[in-house]
Swiss-Prot record:
Cited SUPFAM superfamilies: Periplasmic binding protein-like II, Winged helix' DNA-binding domain
HAMAP family: HTH_type_ArgP (MF_00513)
Keyword presence, Transcription: yes
Domain HTH lysR-type: 4-60
Source species taxonomy: Bacteria, Pseudomonadati, Pseudomonadota, Gammaproteobacteria, Enterobacterales
Cystine crosslinks: none
Record-linked PROSITE patterns: HTH_LYSR
Name the UniProt record assigns to this protein: HTH-type transcriptional regulator ArgP
Role of this protein: Controls the transcription of genes involved in arginine and lysine metabolism.
Complexes and interactors: Homodimer.
Length: 297
């Protein structure tokens, strides 16, 4: 059986996390040549490349498996040494989360865990359609995703759904939709997307108004909180989780442009199996809070 030296695995992990050999060397306090040598040792051991040497480097399929193994072992090792029960070194937890969860329910859900255990979070923000891929690549130990099926050697639980409403300010609605939300009016109304791969707005318009993707003007803004600000100031119409704008809707600062229509995204919590004690606490906290604030039907 091929048993990798975890020192060499940490070199592979550093290259991926630091997005290059030079910064990985600085992180590990060794030379860049030593980093390359350790990864070469790993590749010789497994008889195949573990890195695709692009900019930034990315792991091969075998490299992803090894990184996942490393992160799981590190979690279990830290807990075995007692670092999650009063030890001096905070336990690093890398999680992939979507921006809307981070802006609404995720941090309150994690509050009791953070208060109870010395944890250092590394939250990697990614669209909910792509967070599971970070888990597959071994970059994180848990992910909030819309994918219901678990990866091999992983566990999954349903968290609940975020309901997205198509909203804008009243002045925006009066300007762009004086006769209601129509197909022709939507073609002129500025919208906003999180990034070029965010299809939430386009999917809603295609499903309900038969508008093809790319047919409406769309800003690109990588911030869930900025979506709310853009809508409040009358700059755009956009899809925002109901959970995020309850106060604005109640006060009339924002209005639901299409009552009776919404976009529902069911969320799932993925993580490696077996769970460490700390990850079990995280899972319990996310499931408990998610079932209080997310739609369960």
């Amino acid at each position: 059986m091929k048993r990798p030296d975890y020192r060499t695995l940490q070199a592979l992990d550093a290259v991926i996390r630091e997005r290059g050999f030079e910064r990985a060397a600085q992180k590990l306090c060794i030379t860049q040549s030593a980093v390359s040598q350790r990864i070469k040792q790993l590749e010789n051991l497994f008889g195949q490349p573990l890195l695709v040497r692009t900019v930034p480097p990315r792991p091969t399929e075998q490299g992803q498996k090894l990184l996942a193994l490393l992160h799981q072992v590190e979690l279990l090792e830290e807990e075995w040494l007692g670092n999650d029960n009063g030890g001096d070194t905070p336990l690093l937890l890398s999680l992939a989360v979507n921006a809307d969860s981070l802006a609404t329910w995720l941090l309150p859900a994690l509050k009791p865990v953070l208060a109870d255990s010395p944890i250092r979070l590394n939250l990697q923000v990614e669209d909910e359609t792509r967070t599971q891929e970070r888990l597959r690549r071994g970059e994180v130990v848990g992910a909030v995703s819309i994918q219901p099926q678990p990866l091999p050697s992983c566990l999954v639980d349903q968290l609940g759904a975020l309901d997205y409403l198509f909203v804008a300010s009243k002045p925006f609605a009066e300007r762009y939709f004086p006769n209601g939300v129509t197909r022709s009016a939507l073609l002129k109304a500025p919208a906003v997307a999180f990034d070029h791969l965010d299809d939430m707005h386009q999917a809603f318009l295609q499903q309900n108004f038969d508008l093809s993707p790319g047919s409406v003007p769309c800003h690109i803004v990588n911030s869930s909180e900025a979506f709310v600000q853009l809508a409040r100031q009358g700059t755009t119409c956009c899809m925002i989780p109901h959970l995020q704008i309850e106060k604005e809707l109640a006060s009339g600062e924002l209005i639901n442009l299409t009552p009776g229509l919404l976009q529902r995204r069911m969320l799932f919590w993925h993580r490696f199996a077996p769970e460490s004690r700390t990850m079990r606490k995280v899972t319990d906290a996310l499931l408990s809070y998610g079932r209080q604030v997310l739609r369960q039907d």
